[in-house]
Amino acid sequence: MQIYQPHPWPLTVEEAITIQEELRHQVITEDQFTQPVQYVAGVDMGFEADGTISRAAVAVLSFPDLQVIETNLAYRPTSFPYIPGFLSFREIPAVLDALAKVQTKPDIILCDGQGIAHPRRLGIASHLGVLLNIPTIGVAKSLLIGKHEELADTKGSWQPLIHRGEIIGAVLRTRVGVKPVYVSSGHKISLPTAIDYVLRCTPKYRLPETTRVADKLASNR
C-alpha cells in the first residue's frame, strides 16, 4: 500500500507535536469511500527485547462474513518512546511495513487506538488514515480524553464522547455486561458510520474480529 502523505519520523516530542498539528487539518470526518465494503483490516502491535523491537500485525478479513483473507507481520527497531498521546510515532513505522506486504487492499482499517478522540485530534487511526489516504476507525479499549453520560447495558447502546464542547467520538457497548469501547472517526468516515461498522465487526466479542486476529499475531499467541 502506498504512503500518500509521507513525513520524517520525529525524534522529539516537540517535533511530533508539530507533525500532529499539521496533519490534523487533513483529517476528514465524513464518509468518503466506495460501498459496498468488501474487505476490512485490523492492525495491532507487540514488542520484543524489552520494547526495543516493534512487531506489527495486519489482518485483512472479508466483509460482512469476517473470514480471514490475509495476515502479515513486520519487525523493525522501535525508534520512539512510549508516551501517551504520541503512540502513533512509536507504532506506525512498523505498521506501514506490515501493510506494505498486503496483497488484498482493505476498504476500511480498524485501529486498536484513538482516531480524533485525541488531545490534538490525531490519534493513531487518524494519523494512519491520512498517511495512506484510506478510511480508518479508532476503536480504543480505554478512554484517553472526553466525558460521556452513563451508558445502557444493551449491545449497540452508545453515548457521545465530548471534549471541550466538541463530539469527538462515542462510548459504545459491543456486548451485554462487558466494558464498552471508545470509537472515533479516524479518516474519511463519519462517527455514525464508524459505529455501524464496529458493531458489524463485533458479532461475538467486545473487540472487532479484525483487532482480535491482529492482536493474536502481534502478541505471538
Swiss-Prot record:
NCBIfam families: PRK11617.1. The record marks Y82 as: Interaction with target DNA. The keyword rRNA-binding does not apply. Its EC number is 3.1.21.7. GO terms for cellular component: cytoplasm. It comes from Nostoc sp. (strain PCC 7120 / SAG 25.82 / UTEX 2576). InterPro entries: Endonuclease-V (IPR007581). It is found in: Cytoplasm. Mg(2+) binds at D44, D112. Belongs to the endonuclease V family. One of its GO terms (molecular function) is RNA endonuclease activity, producing 5'-phosphomonoesters. Its main location: cytoplasm. It is an enzyme of class 3 (hydrolase). HAMAP family: Endonuclease_5. DNA repair enzyme involved in the repair of deaminated bases. Selectively cleaves double-stranded DNA at the second phosphodiester bond 3' to a deoxyinosine leaving behind the intact lesion on the nicked DNA. Signal peptide: none annotated. It catalyses: Endonucleolytic cleavage at apurinic or apyrimidinic sites to products with a 5'-phosphate. GO terms for biological process: DNA repair. It holds the Pfam family Endonuclease_5. Its cofactor is Mg(2+). This is Endonuclease V. Keywords: Cytoplasm, DNA damage, DNA repair, Endonuclease, Hydrolase, Magnesium, Metal-binding, Nuclease.
